[in-house]
């Protein structure tokens, strides 16, 4: 299914579906990070090993603030500034942060850290906010293939195996 409704897309995520959506650079695949079956579906679609881990994509700082608590104040300020400073937000910055006890093991793979980005893409911001928190994000492509740059390319890779959020 292809939808342009943020609320419908958020509901699909809550129901355990995998969703393709545009991000700052390429199309991404996402799911509810706490739904292990949805996450497993992404790994199978991409032919990706679980050990690699994925990015958590947030709509605003508050959705991932708990992951900043263990950072030294100087580092925490640097991370926050990269996500909130007007000039810095013109590019997407992903940080590796200490995973707390709330981050499922399947998200971080074999690593003690988790990749986190507070998105600046308006559609992704709305999607995360409507979902009610951060979501899984990984490029929309099978491992070894070029990431999808459009809805059409994502659809060529995954056709009716997933749902799509179009702008």
Language model regions located:
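Active-site-adjacent structural elements in enzyme catalytic cores
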Residues: 1-167
